Amino acid sequence: MSINVNEIVLHQITKSIEGDAMKLNTMLRERLLTITPEVEQMMLQLHQAYQNKSKAYAVFNENSLFAQDLNRFLEHESEFLDFSQKATALLVNELSRYPFADEGTLVLCRYNFLATDYLFIALLDSRASMLVDEQLEIHRTKYLEISQFDIAARLNLTELSLDAKSDRYLTFVKGRVGRKIGDFFMDFLGAEEGLNPQVQNQCLLQAVSDYCAQADLSKEQSQAVKKQVFEYCKGQMNVGEEIALTELSATMPTLNEQAFASFAAEQAYGLAEHIPPVRSALKTLTKFSGSGKGITLSFDAELINQRVFWDEATDSLTIQGLPPNLRDQLQRQLKGQN
């Protein structure tokens, strides 16, 4: 798959110590990067790395300075370079408020991938390494870390232009350090929470359960429908696609002469037409799982009352027919103790 880079620029953020205080500084490019095969390859790798990251959705609030500058650029009232420099200033101003503020290279790029226009923003770290030249001499060198990054956001410019009221045109990386990165990027962009994939997935699961219940399906029949739903969702996750509600409905049986999509709309679950899949939520369609107090359990839902029996009164599970490898471990270790 190819990527078409329209405009791209790099700016540098550095740190300095003034007295007892840390200060962030900027080194701004005065012109855009020339678009070369190397530049396009770098952006393709950044695009792919971003696709694989855990992301949250957001929308601009009414007072977003970033959105105002972006709109001026999109309306051709300013150039991309000018927009990028103002965005860098906003970023540094916001970043300086946080203890995790660090140096980095800021990448801003407008590109097209699969007929969709994007604006990508990321703060990349530099890594030190060694370089061997043509004379087999060793030199110190630095390279951009383009596979591992936590501070990044992307705007779907195509979706924003088609539907300004969309709640999913802006995404940002959640980050491994938790909520702080999320708050920081929300403040920098002047944004607030948009589509919540976790909530959407939970609503989808509830809709599927209710759809089966209103048709008075047996436990086995309901589980078969849920398994169909999971297989479709699993297929979408495997190819990096979202759950398409209409497409999902077409794979499910029609119950009480009403398709699932029609049922979900009628019952007002608030489901989006396209839902980002959340694996941890969807797996509950076919499995029971949990962990705590040194115990981790996971088993297929269809095994309830067949090989796995729950006694609510005694808060216990009885398992008949242990997995062979577990039984083998018990026999070897516990018999050895006796």
UniProtKB/Swiss-Prot annotation:
Family of this protein: Belongs to the YejK family.
Keyword rRNA processing part of the UniProt annotation: no
Name of the protein in its database record: Nucleoid-associated protein PM1885
Subcellular localization: Cytoplasm, Nucleoid
Chief location bin: cytoplasm
Keyword annotations: Cytoplasm
InterPro entries from the UniProt entry: Nucleoid_associated_NdpA
UniProt GO MF annotations: double-stranded DNA binding; single-stranded RNA binding
GO CC terms, sorted: bacterial nucleoid; cytoplasm
UniProt keyword annotation of Cytoplasm present: yes
Signal peptide stretch: none
